[in-house]
Amino acid sequence: MSNQMNTMDITEILKYLPHRYPFLLIDRVLDYTPGESLHAIKNVTINEPFFQGHFPVQPVMPGVLILEAMAQATGLLAFKTMSDDVPPPGVLYYFAGIDNARFRRVVEPGDQIHFEVKMIKERRGIGVFYGEAKVDGEVVCSAEIMCARREINQ
């Protein structure tokens, strides 16, 4: 039995996600098991562009961006479940839905968010996932996320 972890650095992540600055919100994948789960991180710094207006005196990461980062983690898990190969050009996973989103505390500059997502089911290209975002082991956000596999014309 092997304890080898499946990881992804930023170079590998860029091969799977179409997002780029300022909307790429996953910095590293610490571990994943295709068809089961993925653990990724986002390092939150004061240099994030959204902190200029949210909020200048008391910077707080917008909750919708925490959810977007969680959705990006589910997209990575979906791709790794489909195949370990880099996806062909024009294949994307769209954020298709969200249920039971809850926010429990704020995320501030200096925090490191750990995203833990689990695949619940997949049917006809629609994946359903449960995700939690944690800072220092404390859940800051949880949600059920759906993503849809689509091929786009390039």
Swiss-Prot record:
Enzyme Commission designation: 4.2.1.59
Q: Which gene encodes it?
A: fabZ
Provide the GO MF annotations for this entry. (3R)-hydroxyacyl-[acyl-carrier-protein] dehydratase activity
Q: Which family does it belong to?
A: Belongs to the thioester dehydratase family. FabZ subfamily.
Keywords in UniProt for this one? Answer: Cytoplasm, Lipid A biosynthesis, Lipid biosynthesis, Lipid metabolism, Lyase
Q: Name one GO biological process term.
A: fatty acid biosynthetic process
Localization, UniProt: Cytoplasm
Query: Which reaction is catalysed here?
Result: a (3R)-hydroxyacyl-[ACP] = a (2E)-enoyl-[ACP] + H2O
Q: Where is the active site?
A: 54
Name of the featured protein: 3-hydroxyacyl-[acyl-carrier-protein] dehydratase FabZ
Report the domain of life of the source organism: Bacteria
| Chain's role | Involved in unsaturated fatty acids biosynthesis. Catalyzes the dehydration of short chain beta-hydroxyacyl-ACPs and long chain saturated and unsaturated beta-hydroxyacyl-ACPs.
**Would you tell me the Gene Ontology cellular component terms?**
cytoplasm; membrane
HAMAP family from the entry? FabZ
Primary location: cytoplasm
Q: Which Gene3D superfamilies match?
A: Hotdog Thioesterase
Q: Does the keyword Cytoplasm apply?
A: yes
Family matches, as Pfam families: FabA
